[in-house]
């Protein structure tokens, strides 16, 4: 958003000028923008098995550490039901997964300095070994926390606890929180077990209808919406030039829907047998995507066979 403000207004806007309509522009040409997001993962309360807790932890960590967190849709805030019986177990599983992930290079300019500053902050924990080049950090969000309104753009994950009286109350309160207190509106994820059964469908429909995000992903990382060409990809409509947030306009939308509001992606709560190939915990990912690239270059049968075998063996 800072880059956008400098292009349109010639400088970074002061907080008091955010949202104003009458600010003078140095560049009046309209253009499409996609500017990132403080991506929330909403955890809907239910009874989860130990295996499901670990699986969802791997899913969340994948959404955090893909490209080492240098990603416009990287997971940043895990929104948890306070006093939910599995809350501490899920947080512990996320922290454990962060502790065993391989060390990645913090290659982005000034990211090392940002991480070193974060390491010195109060109540922040490094989950991986202190000798690692890139620390994997976690922290509980405080009231009006800076990182509710700013992308951390690194390997740092935050937890937010929402008080609730019942499931529907949590749905409404979590939606209100991410819509109004979390910066950006590019994409949001909701992890809800048995999302389409009779009992839960009303909750799922409420999430998809009321979350003001360009992509709402049920049981998946919103980034997967980007690789589906029929889905629109961009911020939720209505962002002002002087408060651009996740941007204006959209790409993809292969069906050419006029003025799409959002794309909604549904996935199974847990896939059987093995983790998906894009999970950081899937050890075959590098080989599979390498073979997929070769196959897409020439569509040869030989490379198709190699692709299949790389996924199976």
Set out the residue ranges of the language-model regions.
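ALDH superfamily catalytic-core signature
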Residues: 2-145, 218, 298-312
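Conserved C-terminal structural/oligomerization subdomain of aldehyde/semialdehyde dehydrogenase
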Residues: 58-67, 79-81, 89-100, 135-313
């Amino acid at each position: 958003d800072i880059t956008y403000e400098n292009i349109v207004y010639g400088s970074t806007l002061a907080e008091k000028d955010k949202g104003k309509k009458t600010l003078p522009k140095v560049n009046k040409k309209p253009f499409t923008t996609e500017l990132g997001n403080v991506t929330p993962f909403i955890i809907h309360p239910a009874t989860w098995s130990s295996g499901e807790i670990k699986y969802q932890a791997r899913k969340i960590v994948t959404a955090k550490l893909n490209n080492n967190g240098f990603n416009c849709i990287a997971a940043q805030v895990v929104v948890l039901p306070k006093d939910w019986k599995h809350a501490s177990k899920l947080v512990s599983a996320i922290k454990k997964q962060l502790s065993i992930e391989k060390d990645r290079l913090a290659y982005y300019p000034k990211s090392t300095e940002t991480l070193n500053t974060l390491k010195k902050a109060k109540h922040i924990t490094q989950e991986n070994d202190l000798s690692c080049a890139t620390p994997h950090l976690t922290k509980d969000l405080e009231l009006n926390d800076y990182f509710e309104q700013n992308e951390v753009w690194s390997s740092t994950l935050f937890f937010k606890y929402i008080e609730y009286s019942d499931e529907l109350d949590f749905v409404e309160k979590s939606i209100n929180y991410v819509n109004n207190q979390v910066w950006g509106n590019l994409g949001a994820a909701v992890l809800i077990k048995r999302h389409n059964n009779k009992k839960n469908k009303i909750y799922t429909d409420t999430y998809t209808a009321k979350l003001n995000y360009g992509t709402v992903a049920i049981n998946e990382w919103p980034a997967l919406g980007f690789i589906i060409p029929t889905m629109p990809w961009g911020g939720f409509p209505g962002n002002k030039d002087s408060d651009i947030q996740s941007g204006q306009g959209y790409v993809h939308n292969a069906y050419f829907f006029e003025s799409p509001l959002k794309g909604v992606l549904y996935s199974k709560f847990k896939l059987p047998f093995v983790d998906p190939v894009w999970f950081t915990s899937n050890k075959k990912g590098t080989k599979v995507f390498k073979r997929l690239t070769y196959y897409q270059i020439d569509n040869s049968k030989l490379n198709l066979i190699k692709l299949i075998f790389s996924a199976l063996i």
